[in-house]
């Protein structure tokens, strides 16, 4: 079992936040979001983070200055990001392209990168220091659509953290924007290699609406969850390398061990452990919702350069008791069934549902949403310092776990999973995970959190 760094105390000094504006004048206009974008379940802020090592060829270059200038250039093309969201009739979201800019924070931390990243990574532990929540910036309406903090470490390494208003883009759309920034940091001139495309009407509801699918992920369920499961939430991350995945596969019948994807195997394991940890009524129905992109689907021709949301969260419904007591294969079949639902037609059905049912929130009770970010490209963004040592999700949410790619100190590639659970449930979750994996699992057991002292 890998260990985290010992308890550390470090200070982060931040300058006052500033607004970065597009580098040249941009159109003043209103742009409607799609009926996928403005659904209730995407009206939140999602953070991601990248860490970069010192690079000798970049000595003398300040990542803060480099990023700030390239960001302004990129915003000239992605100018809606510099605007603010407003609501129209029936709460329809649209961007008021005001060119007010995005929030940018310059910071320095008296710590070295290798003290934060070792055999595994737990970005949620220190995210509040590397991505300061500027008071008044966290809203959906009338607030900056992006918040960026660049933090220099004393070793010459640095961190790039960004918070995205999820209604504007999915992760692939964000990566497209970050790639444009990266191109400008490396000296590109003119337009981005992939010009941005708005065209949010592409995923507007059809007339008349047509909903041929049963969308379990949006069913409203009465909450009977014990109060203990609604408070004292804690965040932890877990690393799953080849040994851990093999250990999980060993719980499956032979015919499933070689035919099931890593995502299927890992997600089934996490869903089972989480269900056990929450100590739910065995008769209670629970859901697994797998975030799935419509990009690349044969029946959905997404325009190249489109950076809006193109994802759905198809779900499978099973009994909690069956998941907890049945072999792992049972939960995995539920995961596969949820994934198989995703098509272009399914996504259009979601858009129609949003308009017909008044943008219902995804199911909160008994739902577990999993978003695999290992292949979106966050780990390839090169601002001139090479690829990040980690580029991926920064924090989980109570109902949502994210997967990110990570290579440990031994050079072993694996998956970091970010988990958010009530404190008592987290302890049980770890014990359940040990049963599935034994002592292979790299997690936060016996971990003393890093302590931080923040200063403006």
UniProtKB/Swiss-Prot annotation:
Q: Which domain of life is it from?
A: Eukaryota
Any one GO MF annotation of this record: acyltransferase activity
Q: Which residues form the active site?
A: 166 (proton acceptor), 382 (proton acceptor)
Please tell me whether the keyword Signal is annotated for this protein: no
Reply yes or no: does the keyword Transferase apply. yes
Keyword line: Acyltransferase, Transferase
What is one GO biological process annotated to this record?
alcohol metabolic process
| Gene3D superfamilies membership | Chloramphenicol acetyltransferase-like domain
> What EC number(s) does the entry state?
2.3.1.-
Q: Which residues form a coiled coil?
A: none
Say which family it is in: Belongs to the plant acyltransferase family.
The role this protein plays is: Involved in the biosynthesis of volatile esters which confer kiwifruit flavor. Alcohol acyl transferase that can use a wide range of alcohols as substrate to produce esters.
Name of this protein:
Alcohol acyltransferase 1
């Amino acid at each position: 079992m890998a260990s985290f760094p010992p308890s550390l105390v470090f200070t982060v000094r931040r300058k006052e936040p500033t607004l970065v504006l597009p580098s040249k004048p941009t159109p003043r206009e209103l742009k409607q979001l799609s009926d996928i974008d403005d659904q209730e379940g995407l009206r939140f802020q999602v953070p991601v983070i990248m860490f970069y090592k010192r690079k000798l060829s970049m000595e003398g270059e300040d990542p803060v200055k480099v990023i700030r200038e390239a960001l302004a250039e990129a915003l000239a093309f992605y100018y809606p990001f510099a605007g603010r969201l407003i609501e129209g009739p029936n709460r329809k979201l649209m961007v008021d392209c005001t060119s007010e800019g995005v929030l940018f924070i310059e910071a320095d931390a008296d710590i070295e990168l290798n003290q934060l990243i070792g055999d595994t990574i737990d970005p949620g532990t220190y995210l509040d220091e590397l991505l300061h929540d500027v008071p008044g910036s966290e809203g959906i309406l009338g607030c900056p659509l992006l918040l960026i903090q660049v933090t220099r470490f004393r070793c010459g390494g640095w961190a790039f953290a960004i918070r995205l208003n999820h209604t504007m883009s999915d992760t692939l759309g964000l990566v497209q924007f970050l790639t444009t920034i990266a191109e400008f940091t490396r000296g590109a001139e003119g337009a981005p290699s992939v010009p941005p495309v708005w065209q949010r009407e592409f995923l507007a509801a059809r007339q008349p609406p047509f909903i041929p699918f049963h969308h379990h992920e949006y069913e409203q369920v009465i909450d009977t969850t014990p109060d203990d499961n609604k408070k004292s939430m804690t965040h932890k991350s877990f690393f799953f390398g080849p040994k851990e995945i093999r250990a999980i596969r060993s719980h499956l019948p032979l015919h499933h061990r070689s035919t099931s994807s890593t995502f299927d195997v890992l997600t089934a394991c996490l869903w089972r452990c989480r269900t056990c940890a929450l100590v739910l009524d065995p008769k209670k129905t629970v859901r697994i919702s797998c975030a799935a992109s419509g990009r690349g689907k044969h029946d959905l021709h997404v325009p190249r350069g489109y950076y809006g949301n193109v994802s759905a969260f198809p779900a499978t419904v099973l009994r909690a008791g069956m998941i907890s007591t049945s072999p792992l294969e049972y939960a995995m079949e539920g995961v596969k069934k949820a994934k198989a639902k995703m098509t272009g037609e399914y996504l259009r059905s979601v858009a129609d549902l949003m308009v017909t049912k008044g943008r219902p929130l995804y199911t909160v009770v008994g739902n577990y949403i999993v978003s695999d970010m290992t292949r979106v490209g966050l780990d390839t963004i090169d601002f001139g310092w090479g690829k990040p040592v980690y580029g991926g999700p920064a924090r989980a949410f109570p109902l949502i776990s994210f997967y990110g790619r990570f290579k440990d100190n031994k050079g072993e590639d694996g998956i970091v999973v970010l988990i958010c659970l009530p404190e008592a449930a987290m302890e049980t979750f770890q014990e359940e995970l040990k049963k599935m994996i034994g002592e292979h699992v790299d997690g936060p057991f016996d971990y003393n959190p890093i302590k931080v002292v923040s200063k403006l």
